[in-house]
Amino acid sequence: MTSSHSRFTRRRAVIIGALLGAAACATARPSAPAPTASALALLPSPKPAAANEFRDLVGEYDSDAGIVFVIEDSARLWLVDTARATRKRTALVPSSIGSLRITRRIVGPQAGSNQLQVTPVRSVDDVRREALAASPPPEPPAARAPDLVELTTLDSTIKLEIRYATTNNFLGTRFYDEARAFMQRPAAEAVVRANQKLRQLGYGLLIHDAYRPWYVTKMFWDATPLDKHWLVANPARGSNHNRGAAVDLTLFDLATGQAVDMPSTYDESTGRAFADYPGGTSLQRWNRALLRNAMVAEGFLVNPKEWWHFDYKSWRDYPIGNVSFDRIAR
């Protein structure tokens, strides 16, 4: 064998060895650390299967006995009689309901669709001009000075889908010039802790709204028909969003980047939005419970009528805020 051939053989062996080493490094990625006990404690139960074959049957129905729910649980359909204090459940098989006739009720938008729309009763431009010229209601001095911080500055893995920076909201109008989310520092840090625990379980937090300037709350009120005022906060009292101590959010799946399925859409105005709504699928209710557990563990309380809305425990300590996003220190 010639020396040149020997050098070529050695060079080829080095190249092959390097390629094999690179492949080994690519495939032998370190496994993710096991979730901590505090993260595992958030799990409501073992995660149920999606049971998509039942989705078209799950819902609310009218019957001679009143409104009943057809829900999915443990890969079976159940009829839930809400008129009973105990919410009696019956396995949904033909022999179990006898002659009871039920008719499906259409109660809200389909999952993943745009939410309900309310036609503004006044020009949004006029409402905005008046709201910007108005002042929040007077209050006693607050216990704490405002300290608004941006959630994504504290944790860049938190995702934003700020609905009021788009037209996909109940009034179909952009209210924010920028898609940003601020909260008072203790509340923001609590959201970050919840997100970090959830990430250990394969989920992250997706923010729909956080601090909301008071003038936007006044715009909601002035643009909404009187018979729909129950949908929005009264600017005469302000809201916890105005105080920077409330957040609207959901979960997203880290593997897909998509929001998880919940019993209702965001900002839905039906009973499906209630935090303890009994309907839906096992997985929808499990997702809702996981979000609630994560937020409650960090000092938040869920709004009983909105599964996505959480108020921080010290919201009373902060004043109603009216500063726009662009005037908050970056």
Task: Pin down the residues of each PLM region.
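N-terminal secretory signal peptides that target proteins for export/translocation
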Residues: 1-9
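N-terminal export leaders
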Residues: 10-15
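Hydrophobic h-region of N-terminal signal peptides that target proteins for export
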Residues: 18-26
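Peripheral terminal and inter-domain segments
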Residues: 26-134
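K/E-rich alpha-helical interaction surfaces of small helical-bundle regulatory domains
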Residues: 54-67, 295-299, 306, 311
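A mature extracytoplasmic/lumenal domain signature
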Residues: 74, 83, 96, 164-166, ...
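Extracytoplasmic cell-surface/polysaccharide-interacting catalytic and binding patches
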Residues: 116-208, 223-305, 314-330
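Beta-rich nucleic-acid/ligand-interaction surfaces
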Residues: 214-217, 310-317
